[in-house]
Amino acid sequence: MEVTVLIPNYNGLKFLYDCIDCLKKQSIKDFRILVVDNASADESVKWLKENNIDTLVLDKNYGFAGGVNAGIKEVDTAYTILLNNDTKADVYYVENLLKAIKTEEKVFSVSPMMIQAQDNNRIDDAGDGLCIIGFAYQIGVGESIKRYEKKMKVFAACAGAAIYDTALLKELGAFDEAHFAYLEDVDLGYRARLYGYKNLYEPSAKVIHIGSATSGSKYNDFKVKLAARNNIYLHYKNQPLLQLIINALPIALGMFIKFLFFAKKGFLKAYIEGIKEGFASYKKCKRVDFKKVKLSTLIIIEFELIINMFKFVLHFIKRRIDRLY
């Protein structure tokens, strides 16, 4: 057995049947399914036990990061797939992710083609990006799936359906539990990149994703606050002091843009609270050991952050164009 499919769950009973049923229909059968339940208040645990699904039941809600980390400690296979409960995997999903992570050396993670449940012709996520103004973004979201039929390198994998090298996952410290939820996958992918590993996108592995099943909506106070706070953590942890100084103005610009955006959306208070909490508590985060990071790697990533700014704008334009058809 080479891979464990790890499914974090919190009050997700209504999604579990479809998610696990798709896994039972996979082209390969030799893998473990492990559900980590974050103290659900619905009947998730009862259903899982009745259906003989291997389940790790936690005593409280540790968030995505804490829940997944608890599950990772129980994994003894070479690879770990993290799969959101609100997904439906294509029959070749597990097989094609396994093939993809073995194709190159120094691959840490591989992100599949995540497809929007409400429109199966559009991308939900083709990996995650990060740009110089501090915006983390879903690559391809809202665009036609036809634009994303080729393999490529990505800044980070989306932990909603990605495969990871288990040994590296544990070596890198897995997910930062200070994040609780949101941006923890970008943080992990960034960390892997700094230490010289790659994150890939594999279009032949496909999942349909509902999205925001646990938090309840695209934007809410909880999500906006945590994402704002975690964005502070993300930069503090993964950029040395000189790089933070160089990027201070672009990041401030990004924060100002989000300030205006969330003011318009009615979430300004939550955004400001998140920023305040981020600056008040960032030192509790464990920074990357920059003594182990090559200068050339930092320079390459800095240029990538700049290039990703243009890619982010291009994605925005393409998304608007695709909506016309």
Regions found by a protein language model. Name each.
Residues I123-D124, Y137, E143-Y164, V186-L188, ...:
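A recurrent flexible, glycine/aromatic-enriched loop bordering the glycosyltransferase active site
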Residues D21-D30:
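Short, acidic, metal-binding catalytic loop of nucleotide-sugar glycosyltransferases
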Residues T87-L130:
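Conserved donor NDP-sugar-binding/catalytic core segment of glycosyltransferases
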Residues L244-Y325:
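Non-catalytic, C-terminal membrane-associated alpha-helical segments of glycosyltransferases
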Residues T80:
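Short aromatic/hydrophobic "clamp" motif used to bind/position activated sugar donors
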Residues L58-V75, N85:
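Glycine-rich, basic loop-to-helix element that forms the pyrophosphate-binding segment
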Residues F155-K206:
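A short, conserved alpha-helix in the catalytic core of glycosyltransferases
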